[in-house]
Amino acid sequence: PMRLDVVLHGSSKPVGMSELKFIARFDEGDDAEKSAPDVDFIELHPLGRVENCYRWAGETDVFEAIEAVCRNYKIDRDRIVLRGMSMGASGTWHLGLKHPSRFVALGPYCGYVDTHRFSETPISNFIRVGPLPEHQERGLHMLDSIDYAANAAVVPAIAAIGDKDVFFQSHVHMGEVFAKEGIPFVNLISPGTGHVIDPKTHAEQMRRIGEHVAKGLDHAPRALRFVTWTLKYNRCHWLELLALDRHYERAELVANVSSNGTIVVEKAENIREFAIHPPMLQSPAAKFCIDHAFIPLPEPKGDTTRTLVFSKQGGVWKFAGSRASVALTGKRPGVQGPIDDAFATPFLCVRGTGTPWNHSVGAWADASLRRFAYEFARYMRGELP
């Protein structure tokens, strides 16, 4: 199986990246001689619909593209790297820190990491984002990568940037947050370089990424610390968060696994329900402890694929059952909001049939669907059947 590097592109001024413009970057013409690849891995360059740092539809595109490559090529899923430059680096911070168990290493090259401080970059067409209403400030916790910096303890990040880059402050900011989280920050600085990739610095970045690739992913870490602010980003290796006390507030779980498989949860902040996936808690000797109390577990009975759910009920943690048997209610993964998620996965449009009771309403509904079909095709590149 081969290593896969997912490379996210930067923004394109001034009108956005069209499909033809994007494909033209890789067109070598019709000459008989083609440039031979000088690497022993596959590179995937997703377009990512809408230039918003690979959020929403762009995020869906990245993961669907990865799955398509894995179907068509023999890819080692334990050696998938995520890297990018500029907006692509921002997407690398965003996707990598929020999906820390999906990638073996991250390689952001000069990318922004937050909303407020980035908006203060001294560029003429930038609009400074001042204080926002409380609900909007809370919503930023879903977007800003700095709020997920603690997850760099799960997926290593090797950042790089030029010391003359106008966005240099973004990496300074991320370094400050790493320090607060107690995580060393690797930031390779290219002297005298602006907002471009320096070949020498990039080579060192790739060398260090290669060291992590050689080790591969560890799907059963003995120590796990995972931070999120929304159930949209709820999975890290054998841990799956299922319910939070308060959305858009920091949720953190810290757990350690002993030699006999016993899990001790040291911290479960702003979390109401979570699941432990295999290979954890499969041994008869394994126990589960949270809030200094051991919770009785069912006998494995030879089942090595069971996923166990734990819920806080009346302020007390209890075993709730298997993942397949527990019915989730309220905000839950995939139905946690905001409404943008409805257009990031398959959805259903219902066409009117027969004769409408009210012809005016029927005409309005038909016109609305035609408008939606036009706009969805224009911006999201999707045709209604």
Name each region found by the language model:
Residues P1, V172-E176, K180-L384:
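Alpha/beta-hydrolase-fold serine-hydrolase catalytic core, especially in secreted/extracellular enzymes
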Residues L8-G10, C110, I161-G162, E266:
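The conserved beta1-alpha1 loop
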Residues L82-G84, Y109, A160:
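Short beta-strand immediately N-terminal to the catalytic nucleophile in serine-hydrolase-like folds
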Residues T121-I197, A203-G210:
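The feature captures the conserved acid-bearing segment of alpha/beta-hydrolase catalytic domains
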Residues Y54-M87, L97-F103, N151:
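Gly/Ser-rich "nucleophile elbow"/oxyanion-hole loop immediately N-terminal to the catalytic nucleophile
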Residues G10, G16-E28, S101-A149, V154-V155:
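Mobile cap/lid helix-loop segments that gate and shape the active-site cleft of serine hydrolases
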Residues M2-Y73, F347-L348:
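Active-site machinery of serine-nucleophile hydrolases
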Residues G91-L95:
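Hydrolases whose catalytic domains are alpha/beta-hydrolase-1, hotdog thioesterase
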